[in-house]
């Protein structure tokens, strides 16, 4: 009896201890889970903060690089500006580099050239001869140009009536306005040159004697190959037939006809018209 009485309360005590141990384990497991959740949250927050810190670090590094680059560029610009701008040591005032005085140099050079090069006198006979030869060549060139321009205009228009008082067998060239002006200019220049020669003859006797000893320049101008070729081409153009000659020849030309009239222009008889082969016209005085 005593043993059974003793075993009963012991078993109850063991059961209570087991229950309490199980409850403690459950509480510990719950706390453990909570701690794990808290640990994960802290780890995630730390990772987020680490990313933010890395971004800020990159931004700061870029700002530092930009500042260094801007400071370097500003330093280089200052160096270049110092090289360009000079400073006066006593006063410290800035002054720009003096530019070259181009205009003054040009004026001085032109004045020196004018003083060194002698201007030829207008009464020099050599100069007068050269001017005459040049005017002669210019007048010839204007005549040939007018002749060339007048020929195609005549071919396009083809005038049927020739000009009054003009021989068609001779060469005809219509004068241009420029040609008339050039001829008037040459005449005026010839008159003025003659007057100048008469007035300056006693003053330029010594010059003419010196010029007679030296070779004259107008001979070179007149005998130059360009003037000879130009005169040759002008002669060749003058030998060509004019437009009026060709027009007269074409107007007087007749078309050559065949001696025998063609079959299309032959007169047919009545028998050939009505299909009778052996049919002849009745003679005078006969009846059909």
UniProtKB/Swiss-Prot annotation:
Name by which UniProt lists this protein: Coiled-coil domain-containing protein 190
Chain ranges passing through the membrane: none
Biased composition (Basic and acidic residues): 177-188
The keyword Coiled coil is assigned to this record: yes
UniProt organism field: Mus musculus
Keyword match Coiled coil: yes
Keywords, comma-separated and alphabetical: Coiled coil
Region annotated Disordered, chain positions: 141-235
Superkingdom classification of source: Eukaryota
Underlying gene: Ccdc190
Ranges annotated as biased composition (Polar residues): 203-213
PANTHER family: COILED-COIL DOMAIN-CONTAINING PROTEIN 190 (PTHR36871:SF1)
Coiled coil (residue ranges): 16-69
């Amino acid at each position: 009896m005593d043993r059974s009485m003793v075993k009963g309360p012991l078993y109850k005590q063991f059961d209570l201890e087991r229950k309490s141990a199980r409850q403690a384990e459950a509480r510990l497991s719950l706390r453990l889970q909570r701690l794990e959740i808290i640990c994960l949250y802290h780890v995630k927050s730390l990772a987020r903060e680490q990313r933010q810190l890395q971004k800020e670090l990159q931004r700061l590094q870029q700002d530092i690089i930009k500042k260094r680059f801007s400071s370097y560029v500003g330093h280089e610009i200052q160096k270049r500006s110092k090289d360009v701008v000079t400073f006066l040591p006593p006063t410290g005032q800035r002054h720009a580099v003096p530019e070259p005085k181009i205009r003054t140099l040009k004026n001085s050079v032109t004045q020196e050239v004018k003083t060194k090069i002698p201007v030829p006198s207008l009464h020099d006979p050599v100069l007068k001869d050269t001017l005459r030869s040049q005017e002669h060549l210019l007048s010839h060139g204007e005549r040939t140009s007018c002749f060339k321009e007048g020929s195609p205009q005549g071919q396009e228009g083809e005038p049927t009536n020739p000009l009054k008082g003009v021989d068609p067998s001779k060469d005809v060239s219509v004068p241009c306005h420029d040609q008339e002006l050039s001829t008037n200019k040459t005449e005026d220049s010839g008159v003025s040159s003659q007057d100048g020669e008469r007035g300056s003859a006693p003053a330029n006797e010594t010059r003419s004697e010196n010029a007679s000893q030296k070779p004259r320049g107008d001979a070179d101008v007149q005998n130059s190959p360009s003037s000879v070729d130009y005169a040759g081409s002008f002669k060749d153009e003058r030998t060509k037939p004019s437009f009026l000659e060709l027009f007269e020849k074409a107007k007087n030309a007749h078309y050559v006809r065949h001696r025998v009239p063609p079959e299309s222009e032959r007169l047919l008889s009545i028998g050939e018209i009505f299909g009778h082969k052996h049919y002849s016209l009745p003679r005078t005085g006969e009846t059909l």
